[in-house]
Amino acid sequence: EGDFEEQQTETKEISDREKYDGRDDGIVTPVKDQGDTNLCWAYSSIAAAESSILKSGIDSTVTKDTLSLNPMAAAYRVFKRESDPLGNTDGDWQSVNYLMQSGDPLKIAKLYSMWWAPVSGNVVTTNPYENPSYRFENAIYIPENKSNPEEYIRSIKKAIAKYGAVTFQYNNARETLYYNPKNEHSSTLSPHACTIIGW
């Protein structure tokens, strides 16, 4: 019970700060380059997972410089799950170029909730059941709160303070080289995902 109260106090203390940066606490891993893939959603999810692992202290053998989960392997398994150990997902294979598929962080949360674990290393086809780096236990969803943006921001700060990072998606409708309002017609899609590590 003491650990819970201590964590609650720390979460409140951090979320009440005028500014916070998880890098100052050593819980943010180096930025990974998604290259020319559409996998920002996988990269942002893995970055948040890495920060959560470091924040929680569940693995004393890793640091921000040594912890490196594979976002491409996570994206690969979203589209090419194959069979789970119980045979419940036999035939779950999509013949798509997973590197170019859009997605959202919720896809990773759903995948990991089915015990498809994150993996380390560079091999995207690594079996996540036989070679898990960690196991997913929970995810927190913060619904958008347009009627009370201050409370929405407070919820995000509390989640960062408690877990280390959050992911989000946005639809950038301003006109730039890569984002252009002529091409973004107020769709329900959010074409980019990022990780927030502070404020």
Locations of regions flagged by a protein language model:
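Catalytic-core signature of thiol
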Residues: 1-199
